[in-house]
Amino acid sequence: MKIFNYKRVPYAEMRAFSVHILTASGSFLAFLGVVAAAEHRFIDMFWWLGLALLVDGIDGPIARKVRVKEVLPNWSGDTLDNIIDYVTYVLLPAFALYQSGMIGEPWSFVAAGMIVVSSAIYYADMGMKTDEYFFSGFPVVWNMIVFTLFVIDASATTALTVVIVSVVLTFLPINFLHPVRVKRLRPLNLGVFFLWSALGIFSLLMHFDTPEWALILFIVTGAYLYVIGAVLQFFPALGRET
């Protein structure tokens, strides 16, 4: 007499589910980031956040490779991914901004509140992507914005202005770049993105004591990534293959 009726799990399902576990691990990395931010260890927080973003960058291609949607149709990788993205792209950066007191009281609290509410609404927008894979409206990449504010040691006025402008742009039909999927100027866009990322890592290694030359390059490349989508929107022939 069998007490337990075990069912053999096919290897394909085990492999596919392991990808969901990889994606979900981003939540634990984000939790470690929250702990670090709560203790004002912002350098450590950004390292944890960077590791979470690395996981976010590799889980998608792996999921497509092992056909997760086909093998596990009852498990939504998109929903899981959105949950992790909201925590790592929005909630953790907003908490870090608040904890840092960069904007002062009560505006750090107000700014963080604006970030989390506007971003939650943006995630419900089914039309956030254009036909060319631009984001329509600021794509709530608050991880990049808040990280930039830390790197440049932004003043309260600068930080609050950047937050307000970005929140407003969340709801306007202004294009923002997806550096990988947008085809127009893709080599240049990817080059600028990788340079910005390398400079950010360098700044972390320097504990935000960044040399002036690196700081200028970081600001220029970040500004390019922020505005190039709108530039390509208003100049539709720019970067198109002839």
UniProtKB/Swiss-Prot annotation:
Which keywords accompany this UniProt record? Cell inner membrane, Cell membrane, Lipid biosynthesis, Lipid metabolism, Manganese, Membrane, Phospholipid biosynthesis, Phospholipid metabolism, Transferase, Transmembrane, Transmembrane helix
Q: Which GO terms describe its molecular function?
A: phosphatidylcholine synthase activity
List the cofactors. Mn(2+)
Q: Which InterPro entries match?
A: CDP-OH_P_trans, CDP-OH_PTrfase_TM_dom, PcS
Record GO biological process: phospholipid biosynthetic process
The record's catalysed reaction(s) read: a CDP-1,2-diacyl-sn-glycerol + choline = a 1,2-diacyl-sn-glycero-3-phosphocholine + CMP + H(+)
Top-rank EC class of the record's enzyme: transferase
Q: Can you supply one Gene Ontology CC term for this chain's record?
A: plasma membrane
Extract the signal peptide range: none
Q: Does the keyword Lipid metabolism apply?
A: yes
- Give me the Cytoplasmic side stretches, as residue ranges: 1-15, 63-76, 122-133, 181-187, 236-242
Residue intervals passing through the bilayer: 16-36, 42-62, 77-97, 101-121, 134-154, 160-180, 188-208, 215-235
UniProt membrane topology term: Multi-pass membrane protein
EC nos: 2.7.8.24
Residue intervals annotated with topology Periplasmic: 37-41, 98-100, 155-159, 209-214
Q: Which residues form a coiled coil?
A: none
Q: Give the UniProt subcellular location, in the record's own words.
A: Cell inner membrane
| Recorded family membership | Belongs to the CDP-alcohol phosphatidyltransferase class-I family.
Q: Could you tell me what this protein does?
A: Condenses choline with CDP-diglyceride to produce phosphatidylcholine and CMP.
The protein in question is named: Phosphatidylcholine synthase
Species for this entry? Rhizobium johnstonii (strain DSM 114642 / LMG 32736 / 3841) (Rhizobium leguminosarum bv. viciae)
Record gene name:
pcs
